[in-house]
From Swiss-Prot:
GO cellular component term, pick one: cytoplasm
Example of a GO biological process term: fatty acid biosynthetic process
Domain of life: Bacteria
Organism annotation: Desulforamulus reducens (strain ATCC BAA-1160 / DSM 100696 / MI-1) (Desulfotomaculum reducens)
Protein name from the UniProt record: 3-hydroxyacyl-[acyl-carrier-protein] dehydratase FabZ
Keyword Calcium: no
Length: 142
């Protein structure tokens, strides 16, 4: 549905911090499904951990937030703005994410009032849940 070029028109993030490769499904302001292809070339793997590369959990959370931001920032009312973390609740990591994995990230917007919102995000590798969290966000000006 959205390739990397379209994603870069919506999100301000760039390499090495753009953690969304493709959007597969989207209902603006409601629900979104995106992909992060995890490769051996990720800049964090040499240090996390040498000889045993694991994607840091905080970056899995960040990838979930970026996918969710696409659904919000695609709305005409929020176009050209930026989504910022306002909180993270109930974060759980269920499996390690390693080079070669494809993260399928599903985000459902639970609440959006003005410039403050809450979403439920889940990241899967195949059919296995890798991580989940409730993400609170604020929409700001760039």
């Amino acid at each position: 549905m959205l390739d990397i070029n379209a994603i870069q028109q919506i999100l301000p993030h760039r390499y090495p911090f753009l953690l969304v490769d493709r959007i597969l499904e989207m209902e603006e302001g409601k629900r979104v499904v995106g992909i992060k292809n995890v490769t051996a070339n990720e800049p964090f793997f040499p240090g996390h951990f040498p000889g045993y590369p694991v994607m840091p959990g905080v970056l899995v959370i960040e990838a979930m937030a970026q996918v969710g931001a696409v659904a919000i920032l695609s709305m005409p009312a929020y176009a050209g703005r930026i989504a910022l973390f306002a909180g993270i609740d109930k974060a759980r990591f269920r499996r390690q994410v390693v080079p070669g994995d494809t993260l399928r990230i599903e985000v459902e917007v639970l609440k959006l009032r003005g410039t403050i919102g809450k979403s439920m995000a889940r990241a899967y590798v195949g059919e296995e849940l890798a991580a989940e969290a409730e993400l609170m966000f604020a929409i700001g000006q760039k």
